Every structure is written in C-alpha cells, then in structure tokens.
C-alpha cells in the first residue's frame, strides 16, 4: 500500500489552539482543539495509529499556498464559528475516519446553520432511526474534524450539553460565539 503524506500544523486562535492536518493540496483531513500542543500531537498520533500508510509530518517553514490557504480559512472559521457553513464551500476536505453511519451524522450536522442547534433524537429521526439518539451522540463524539463538522451544535432533547470531544466549556463558548450577528468579511469571497 502506497504511503500518503499528510502535513500538520498548530495554529493559535484567541481562545485555544487548533491542530490541523491536510494533504499537500490543502484538503482538510483532521482538526483538533485544545490548549496544550503536546496533548494535541499525542492525540493526533493515537487517532491516526490504525492508518499505517498515512505519514504525518509537521509543517516546517512556510507551507505551500494551498495548505496555507486552508490553515488561514480554518483560523478565520475558528475565530468566528458563524463562518463554518461558508467554509464548507471553500475548504476542501476528506473523511477518512468514521463508519458510514457516523459520516451520515456528520453530513447532517454540516447542514445545520450557525446559531441553530439540533438534538440527537431529532437527528436520529431524520436518519430513519428514531430510537438511536445515543448512536448519534456517539457519532458526534467520534468526529475528528473539529468545528468544520459542527458537533458543538448537537444537544440533548432538553437542550442540555451532554459532552463534547474537546470539552464542554469550549462547546459552550462556540455556541455563544455563534449567537453574535454576522458581519460581512471582504476576505471571505468565494474562489
């Protein structure tokens, strides 16, 4: 099996750090959030451990223009999560993690709008599995592309936060950030 080379970088955003993994063409494969770079790197390596043909390399020096563009767009999205849906059209991505069902859940979440939340049970019903809200919750927990797949928008039926792979305080912050009115960004013109 041929090796697939992926690049990773840790970027700073105002409230945390993000570890981003792309291919050499800038397609997003993975994103994780947290305050400790060393923990982000260890977690990434564990998450990729089953993919023996994926070779993870840190970006040293300046990244190529495609990778740099993805990193910058992710940073903008992280600073203002109301831009997530816009970035779905601007950042190329590839799901390598997850089962077919998990990917269906993630795609459904990618169709939610900023400042909207959805409950696990409603998502399960939408997928034709009305009694599988826990399965949907587990799929959210298995998401490996933070923010881009907006699992922070998924809540319990009562509107409570039941968990978040990157921590409940971060989920609360993201939901709060999405409640602010969106202002047009001239730098976000579609390409």
Swiss-Prot record:
GO terms for biological process: DNA repair; methylation. The keyword Membrane does not apply. Keywords: DNA damage, DNA repair, DNA-binding, Methyltransferase, Nucleus, Transferase. The active site is at residue 151. GO terms for molecular function: DNA binding; methylated-DNA-[protein]-cysteine S-methyltransferase activity. SUPFAM superfamilies: Methylated DNA-protein cysteine methyltransferase, C-terminal domain. It holds the Pfam family DNA_binding_1. It catalyses: a 6-O-methyl-2'-deoxyguanosine in DNA + L-cysteinyl-[protein] = S-methyl-L-cysteinyl-[protein] + a 2'-deoxyguanosine in DNA; a 4-O-methyl-thymidine in DNA + L-cysteinyl-[protein] = a thymidine in DNA + S-methyl-L-cysteinyl-[protein]. GO terms for cellular component: nucleus. The keyword Cell wall biogenesis/degradation does not apply. DNA binds at residues 120, 134. InterPro entries: MethylDNA_cys_MeTrfase_DNA-bd (IPR014048), MethylDNA_cys_MeTrfase_DNAb (IPR036217), WH-like_DNA-bd_sf (IPR036388). Its EC number is 2.1.1.63. It is found in: Nucleus. Involved in the cellular defense against the biological effects of O6-methylguanine (O6-MeG) and O4-methylthymine (O4-MeT) in DNA. Repairs the methylated nucleobase in DNA by stoichiometrically transferring the methyl group to a cysteine residue in the enzyme. This is a suicide reaction: the enzyme is irreversibly inactivated. NCBIfam families: ogt. This enzyme catalyzes only one turnover and therefore is not strictly catalytic. According to one definition, an enzyme is a biocatalyst that acts repeatedly and over many reaction cycles. Belongs to the MGMT family. This is Methylated-DNA--protein-cysteine methyltransferase. The gene is MGT1.
């Amino acid at each position: 099996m041929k090796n697939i080379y992926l690049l990773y970088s840790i970027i700073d955003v105002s409230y945390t750090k993000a570890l981003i993994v792309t291919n050499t063409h800038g397609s997003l494969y993975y994103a994780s959030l947290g305050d400790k770079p060393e923990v982000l790197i260890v977690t990434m390596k564990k998450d990729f451990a089953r993919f023996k043909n994926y070779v993870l390399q840190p970006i040293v020096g300046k990244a190529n223009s495609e990778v740099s563009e993805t990193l910058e767009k992710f940073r903008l999205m992280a600073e203002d999560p109301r831009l997530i849906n816009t970035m779905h059209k601007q950042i190329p991505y590839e799901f390598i993690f997850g089962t077919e069902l998990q990917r269906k859940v993630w795609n459904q979440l990618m169709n939610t709008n900023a400042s909207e939340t959805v409950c696990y049970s409603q998502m399960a019903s939408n997928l034709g599995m009305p009694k599988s809200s826990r399965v949907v919750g587990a799929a959210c927990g298995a998401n490996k592309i933070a923010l881009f797949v907006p699992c922070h928008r998924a809540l319990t039926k009562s509107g409570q936060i039941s968990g978040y792979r990157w921590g409940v305080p971060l989920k609360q912050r993201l939901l709060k950030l999405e409640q602010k009115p969106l202002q047009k960004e001239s730098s976000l013109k579609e390409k």
